[in-house]
A protein has these predicted regions:
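Flexible, acidic active-site loops/lids enriched in D/E/S/T/G that coordinate Mg2+ and/or position polar
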Residues: 49-72, 79, 98, 102, ...
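Generic hydrophobic alpha-helical segments
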Residues: 12-16, 59, 159
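An N-terminal boundary/leader segment
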Residues: 1-54
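Enzymes and membrane/adaptor proteins characterized by extended Gly/Ser/Thr/Asp/Glu-rich
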Residues: 37, 71-111
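Short glycine/serine-rich loop segments
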Residues: 104-171
């Protein structure tokens, strides 16, 4: 399975469609990778394990029935914490939004879900995405996987760190 987790996005989508790997295994593989690296990176600020695994099981079941939900069918992803997600808190890295749960997905999130992607969690961002480094009062600083004394930058620092650590295919 490790070689499939190391493939590019196209390779992963082809592996799922050819039944070389299930969406459940792919999602669990990336959840395991996130768990392994996130304590040192602080890249993922919230995780959606139970829902992600249920959606992956549904993607696998649908694929067996010949139903494909789009080009990203069953592929795990994360999303920046500045994008609204109906099933997860969206803080924008600011204290005033620590418990804010939007009523709907941002358009980009909805389109990714419609394309079949499975949202695993949210990645860290500077407050209001307005800094050259990813640090905020809600979740703290994100570290660069190649040098933990440095930041991966901003405003998508959580996403950048996670992708650089090969812990998610895209964000």
């Amino acid at each position: 399975m490790e070689d499939i987790l190391d493939r590019n996005l196209r390779g992963m989508t082809e592996a799922v469609r050819r039944n070389e790997i299930t969406s459940v295994d792919l999602v669990q593989g990336f959840l395991d990778r996130i768990e392994k690296v996130n304590s040192s990176l602080n890249a993922v600020v919230s995780i959606n394990t139970e829902i992600a695994l249920k959606l992956a099981a549904k993607a696998d079941s649908d694929l067996k029935e010949g139903i494909v939900h789009g080009p990203l069918h069953g592929i795990p992803m994360t999303i920046k914490d500045s994008l609204d997600t109906k099933d997860m808190v969206t803080t924008w890295g600011t204290k005033g939004r620590e418990t804010f749960r939007p009523g709907r997905d941002a358009t980009s999130v909805a389109r990714l879900r419609d394309a079949g992607a499975i949202l695993l969690g949210k990645t860290n961002t500077p407050e209001f995405t307005l800094s050259f480094q990813t640090d905020n009062l809600v979740y703290g600083r994100t570290n660069n996987p190649y040098n933990l004394e440095m930041t991966p930058g901003g405003s998508s620092g959580g996403a950048a760190a996670l992708i650089a650590a090969n812990a998610i295919p895209f964000d």
